[in-house]
Amino acid sequence: MKIPFVEPVICLSVFAVTLNSPLTTQYVYRRIWEETGNYSIALESNTSECAKNKSSPIFAFQEEVQKKVSLFNLEMDISGLIPGLVSTFVFLSHSDHGGRKFPLILSSVGALANSAWLCLLSYFALPIQLLIASTFIGALFGNYTTFLGASFAYIVDQCKEKKQRTIRIAIIDFLFGVVSGLTGLSSGYFIRGLGFVWSFLIVTVALFVNLIYILLFLEDSMKESSSQNISVSWTETFKNLFHRTYMLFKNASGEQQSLCCLLLFTMITYFFVTIGVSPIFVLYELDSPLCWDEVLIGYGSALGSVTFFSSFLGIWLFSYCMEDIHMAFIGTFTTMVGMAMTAFARTTLMMFLVRLPFLFTVMPLSVLRSMISKVVHSTEQGTMFACLAFLETLGGITAVSTFNGIYSATVAWCKGFVFLLSAVLLLIPAISLCVIKYVSRNTGSYVLLIQEESSEDTSDR
């Protein structure tokens, strides 16, 4: 019996990714720490080997470890950049004809293989440089962006009514927040109670169950497209996609082109900063003067997941009293404040308190997606969001690589520099929002949507 629900797939995937991310970072940190010198880290805590006194010999040693870890993360991110970008573009564009299960299966196989390799790597204490090769090979099968893109496309295929689609997507956001929050909260206890090998094995089992569900139980959302699979080649698929993208901007008026490009630029720059700096939090928390252990890192990860709930509540409440662009301003400004506060956080209490300004971090992304959907025709929504997914994949991988490189170069003389830089860079989307406000006020807000609705009313008459 086939099941037409992709929600269990997303829940298992979010659990695996949320648990695997801090596991991998802390495992690499411990391995590089032990390989760089004669110091070792007890599994129960890392605070015994984290020096807060700058005159201590361990202090200079841990600065070197921080630099090596961030450089290693940079190498891993770069190794998966090109194959991840190409595979995401190829698999998602092909799914319009080949079905949504195709990218879901491939990306799940890649994630499963990578997780199984981490189990072997940690069990046999193999050289961690092999992680770079496994990241490259795994990216050939797609990445997490590929998986999520196919999952949301699966939901869109099923939901013909806009209201039903909104409810399903809202449920996904809710599940994403719940699963990632609970997993982040428990990740430290997984490491402390089970160790790295068993923790990686749990991730592998979750991904294996996920793959079995997709292969045997998940119903394909595009049954009618099976007859088109032979007649439509990959070359034609690429040509059609590029042609639709070209026509999307060619057919728009000058004002619409300007507004659309500004919205895309604003969203990608904001996405670049927030995604790029997010992996640095774990390294920052492991280093002095915080010297967090795995449990505290899990608490911090769980608090970071609260932003999914708070941003959703913020949009729901603010939508009654302000425009979309004002909500984007609030989210950008509060995130900017949070970045600046993080740069000067020197105690555990302060590091927990800096999570408060990040409560609306996701809000600008959701609002900007909504604004983008309002400036293009209903028949061009798919093409626009395909472009957006491509830019997010490119920007996300590039951002993580860039910020890891910056942190590696600056950790010795200013640990919080990368967060101060992030706060400054957020001025770019803030200024861009001001320009959007000015342009939309002069040309009329969401001109195309109004014209489209009026033309539909005229045709109905």
UniProtKB/Swiss-Prot annotation:
Extracellular topological domain residue ranges: 26-70, 125-133, 192-195, 283-294, 346-347, 404-415
Report the transmembrane regions from the record.
Answer: 71-91, 102-124, 134-156, 171-191, 196-216, 262-282, 295-315, 325-345, 348-368, 383-403, 416-436
- Stored Pfam families: MFS_1
Q: How does it sit in the membrane?
A: Multi-pass membrane protein
Coordinates of motif Tyrosine-based lysosomal-sorting motif in the sequence? 446-449
GO cellular component terms given for this protein: lysosomal membrane
Q: Which residues are glycosylated?
A: 38, 46, 53
Extract the InterPro entries matched here: MFS, MFS_trans_sf
Which stretches of this protein does UniProt put in the Cytoplasmic compartment? 92-101, 157-170, 217-261, 316-324, 369-382, 437-461
Alphabetically, the GO molecular function entries are:
symporter activity; transmembrane transporter activity
Q: Where is the signal peptide?
A: 1-25
Physiological role: Lysosomal proton-coupled steroid conjugate and bile acid transporter. Preferentially recognizes lipophilic steroid conjugates or bile acis as endogenous substrates and seems to mediate escape from lysosomes to the cytoplasm. Modulates hepatic cytosolic copper homeostasis, maybe acting as a lysosomal copper transporter and sequestering copper ions in the lysosome. Delivers pathogen-associated molecular patterns to cytosolic pattern recognition receptors as part of the innate immune response to microbes.
Query: Sorted alphabetically, which PANTHER family does this protein's record hold?
Result: LYSOSOMAL PROTON-COUPLED STEROID CONJUGATE AND BILE ACID SYMPORTER SLC46A3 (PTHR23507:SF9), ZGC:174356 (PTHR23507)
Its name, as the record gives it, is Lysosomal proton-coupled steroid conjugate and bile acid symporter SLC46A3
